[in-house]
């Protein structure tokens, strides 16, 4: 059995050309206090230079390579033409659909079965010409593994686990069910797509599935670098450590004095072509050397998008991925039939651990709607009783008290009810995102939204801070429920970040059960129409320059520096179903030239968010600060290329509904184990009926999915919306206890909580692959389930990587048997 390098054993280089690392100017003596052993030095470069990402570790050319640009342009133009239609633009013409391929294969097999009675040689010729899956060109590695290994099981290193549950092993030839030429072409395309994602994740210091990386290492000319994305705790967590992390000794927003902040690097900042560049002097001129930080090259990004767009509509590749997904679904059903009782028995053996007593993270929830409607109603009534004379609003230059605001609406506390509040989504919001957005206004009045659920208002967000702290108190009381709340930055002015940070610090809005994500609504067209922005680059400057300033000189933004340590990353939000009038390509205007009132396309927002985040992450990593990830809303509606952009650039996504109609992308998301936070109740009110939601299908196939609430104010009724989400899903889809605990474990793995916190919640070995990384005493997920997921993923990765390797190996005699079960 072949051996594979374990995670963390190889120390190697990036698979792309890396720009020079962070260096400091000798003219900036302050830098020494910030970077310690990694001083900054000047390095001459031109603004806009980027690392070369064009070199794959091996030859992955396919038959589509010369046509990628033309295919992608055709798809993008079709997307624009069909944006008015409800049908999605990824439903392509019937040039090579799966049904035709299936019918053709069945006809051939029927013909073979009829002719073999008359002429046995026909069968042999047919196998050689059409079903030549595992013969001449098959894998030398299979040959080495095949003899004597198939009957002994898959995993020699874990004999105990092997005896614990039953497996289904597919042996013999033609296991993937497609012609070998199609298998080879599909495998090369899939591997190429995975390499594309790996290089962008490495470029931005985001995480990449270690199991997938380990298999890609077999194909790389040089081993891929294994990176640690979270700072390890000073003291490792022991195996017997308590499930609850130790309480903080002091509030994290204490010591906000500038004198207590890290030193000033004395670097200059300027945005060039939509990306912030860092210079060695505070006021850079044309000849000032630049501190070189890596960011993606625009030309290569567009080329990579074209490759993936061409890949997802290739007929043979669609057939291959569709078959693999169907196989994964069937295999899971067989696993459940064989091992369900063993999984349940393993859970029952664990003392004081059940679904209620394991950590769950709401990985997709908006802060402005994190409370339920009854909670908001009670808070408004309480405010009307206690703060009736407080000045809360300014209307046309005149200050108004809370009493005057409600008198202008002809309302009293007695008149208010849940029905009057009218914030809950109903049947009228289905496919009407505009009506859904209106539900954010209590009683249909935007002034109440501004007073009660905004951070920037006349009272500096006092009411909103109080209600958020009440939600946090409920989470802390439950002990095992956590949330990642989204706060908004719009990019209309440079001081938005400081106002948001002051709101959090001054009101001490913090909880060990809560992390923050910052969402950026894609509303440039609205701001441009109102004359609030001159061009798109101004919006990018308002979003990212304060973050770079707080990193270079934390004392200049003390509250922001403290706040950013509790921010996980960035989210991109808006109605994805809105038509896009532009295609992002090399002819698209640069951000400083985007002055029209049309909104840039989704990929445009995502690319420039990613590029600036990548630069910022490298700067912050050198200073020892917390880094960020990209976790956008994606795949809820709209065109398929949203999911293509997210596959390349995002660590996790929210929604992902459209993957159900894109088998190639769904298979890629599975192989890369990209987290998908799904909200079935939210989707049920907006885009997709509950019974049609693909979550149970994704879960059975092994995609990294979790349950989330999205907007409890609009969609939920109880005090514990996350438990409500789990309970409804369990009842409707008949999920088992193991399924529910697996979803909860996935939510913790996907979340942005620190490595130390996750070590307490999941166990100190949670970063290890397979059952070794599972602690059933903390997760209540049986090793049987984790082992099944791990083995299945390894087998799928082995199928595609070994098919690619087969081209580089000598011909294998046809009579040699083949076993497709590599060791870990």
Curated annotation (Swiss-Prot):
Please list the coiled coil stretches: none
Query: What are the entry keywords?
Result: Hydrolase, Metal-binding, Methylation, Nucleotide metabolism, Phosphoprotein, Zinc
Where does this protein have compositionally biased stretches of type Basic residues? Answer: 10-20
Region of interest (Disordered), residue spans: 1-43
Q: In what pathway does it function?
A: Purine metabolism; IMP biosynthesis via salvage pathway; IMP from AMP: step 1/1
Effect of inactivating the gene:
Mice have normal brain histology.
Please tell me where Zn(2+) binds in this chain: 364, 366, 633, 710
Residues with PTM Phosphothreonine: 133
Give the Phosphotyrosine positions (modified residues). Answer: 90
Catalysed transformations (reactions)? AMP + H2O + H(+) = IMP + NH4(+)
One Pfam family assigned to this protein is AMP_deaminase
Q: Which CDD domains match?
A: AMPD (cd01319)
Catalytic-site annotation from UniProt: 655 (proton acceptor)
Any idea which residues bear Phosphoserine here?
45, 63, 79, 96, 113, 135, 137
Gene Ontology CC entries for this record: cytosol
For the ligand (substrate), the binding residues are 366, 435-440, 636, 711-714
EC number, as in UniProt = 3.5.4.6
PTM Omega-N-methylarginine: list the residues.
Answer: 44
BP-aspect Gene Ontology terms: AMP metabolic process; ATP metabolic process; cholesterol homeostasis; cyclic purine nucleotide metabolic process; energy homeostasis; GMP salvage; GTP metabolic process; IMP biosynthetic process
**Name of the protein this chain belongs to:** AMP deaminase 2
Q: Which organism is it from?
A: Mus musculus (Mouse)
Q: What is the lineage of its organism?
A: Eukaryota, Metazoa, Chordata, Craniata, Vertebrata
């Amino acid at each position: 059995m072949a051996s594979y390098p374990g995670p963390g054993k190889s120390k190697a280089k990036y698979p792309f050309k890396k720009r020079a690392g962070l260096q400091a100017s000798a003219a900036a003596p302050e830098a020494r206090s910030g970077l310690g052993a990694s001083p900054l030095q000047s390095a001459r470069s031109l603004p806009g230079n980027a690392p070369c990402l064009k070199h794959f570790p091996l030859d992955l050319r396919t038959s589509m390579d010369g046509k990628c640009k033309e295919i992608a342009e055709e798809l993008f133009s079709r997307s624009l033409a069909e944006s008015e239609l409800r049908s999605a633009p990824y439903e392509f013409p019937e040039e090579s659909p799966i049904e035709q391929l299936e019918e053709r294969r069945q006809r051939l097999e029927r013909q073979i079965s009829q002719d073999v009675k008359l002429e046995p040689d026909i069968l042999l010729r047919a196998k050689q010409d059409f079903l030549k899956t595992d013969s001449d060109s098959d894998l030398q590695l299979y040959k080495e593994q095949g003899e004597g290994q198939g009957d002994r099981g898959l995993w020699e290193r874990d004999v105990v686990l092997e005896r614990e549950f039953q497996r289904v092993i597919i042996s013999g030839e033609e296991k993937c069910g497609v012609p070998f030429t199609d298998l080879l072409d599909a495998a090369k395309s899939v591997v190429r797509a995975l390499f594309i994602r790996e290089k962008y994740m490495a470029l931005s210091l985001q995480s990449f599935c270690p199991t997938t990386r380990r298999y890609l290492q077999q194909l790389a000319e040089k081993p891929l670098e294994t990176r640690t994305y979270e700072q390890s705790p000073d003291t490792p967590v022991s195996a017997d450590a308590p499930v609850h992390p130790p309480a903080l000794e002091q509030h994290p927003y204490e010591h906000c004095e500038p004198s207590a902040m890290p030193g000033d690097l004395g670097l200059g900042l300027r945005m060039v072509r939509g990306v912030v560049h860092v210079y060695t002097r505070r006021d850079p001129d044309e000849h000032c050397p630049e501190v070189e930080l890596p960011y993606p090259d625009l030309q290569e990004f567009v080329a990579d998008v074209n490759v993936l767009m061409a890949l997802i509509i290739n007929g043979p590749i669609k057939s291959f991925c569709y078959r693999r997904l169907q196989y994964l679904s069937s295999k899971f059903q067989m696993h459940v039939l064989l091992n369900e009782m063993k999984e349940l028995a393993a859970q029952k053996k664990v003392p004081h651990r059940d679904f209620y007593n394991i950590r769950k993270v709401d990985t997709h929830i908006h802060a402005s709607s994190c409370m339920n409607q009854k909670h908001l109603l009670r808070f408004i009534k309480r405010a009307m009783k206690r703060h009736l004379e407080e000045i809360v609003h300014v209307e046309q230059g005149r200050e108004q008290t809370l009493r005057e605001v409600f008198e202008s609406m002809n309302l009293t506390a007695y008149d208010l009810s849940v029905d009057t509040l009218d914030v809950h989504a109903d049947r009228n919001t289905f496919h009407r995102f505009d009506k859904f957005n209106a539900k954010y206004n209590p009683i249909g009045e935007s002034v109440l939204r501004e007073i009660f659920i905004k951070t920037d208002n006349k009272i500096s967000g006092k009411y909103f801070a109080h209600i958020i702290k009440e939600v946090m108190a409920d989470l802390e009381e439950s002990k095992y429920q956590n949330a990642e709340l989204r706060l908004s930055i719009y990019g209309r002015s440079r001081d938005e970040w400081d106002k948001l940070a002051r709101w959090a610090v001054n009101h001490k809005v913090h909880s060990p059960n809560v992390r923050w994500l910052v969402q950026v609504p894609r509303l440039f067209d609205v701001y441009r129409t109102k004359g609030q922005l001159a061009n798109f680059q101004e919006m990018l400057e308002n979003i990212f320059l304060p973050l770079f300033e707080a990193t270079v000189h934390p004392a200049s933004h003390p509250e922001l520096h403290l706040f950013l340590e509790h921010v996980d990353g960035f989210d991109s939000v808006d109605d994805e179903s809105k038509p896009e009038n532009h295609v992002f390509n090399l002819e698209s205007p640069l951000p400083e030239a985007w002055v029209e009132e049309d909104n840039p396309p989704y990929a445009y927002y995502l690319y420039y968010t990613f590029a600036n985040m990548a630069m910022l992450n490298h700067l912050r990593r050198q200073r020892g600060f917390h880094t960020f990830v990209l976790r956008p809303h994606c795949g809820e509606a709209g065109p398929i290329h949203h999911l293509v952009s997210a596959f390349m650039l995002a660590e996790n996504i929210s929604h992902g509904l459209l993957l159900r109609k894109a088998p190639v992308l769904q298979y890629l998301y599975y192989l890369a184990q990209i987290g998908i936070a799904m909200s079935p109740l939210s989707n049920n009110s907006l885009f997709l009926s509950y019974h049609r939601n693909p979550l149970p299908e994704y879960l059975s196939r092994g995609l990294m999915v979790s349950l989330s609430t999205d907007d409890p104010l609009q969609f939920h009724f109880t005090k514990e919306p996350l438990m409500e989400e789990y309970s409804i899903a369990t009842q409707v889809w008949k999920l088992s206890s193991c399924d529910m605990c697996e979803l909860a474990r996935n939510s913790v793995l996907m979340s942005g909580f620190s490595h130390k916190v996750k070590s307490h919640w999941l166990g100190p070995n949670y970063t290890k692959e397979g059952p070794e990384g599972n602690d059933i005493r903390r997760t209540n997920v049986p090793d049987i389930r984790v082992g099944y997921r791990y083995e299945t993923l390894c087998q799928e990765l082995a199928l595609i990587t070994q098919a690619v390797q087969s081209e580089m190996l000598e011909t294998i005699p046809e009579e040699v048997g083949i076993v497709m079960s590599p060791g870990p």
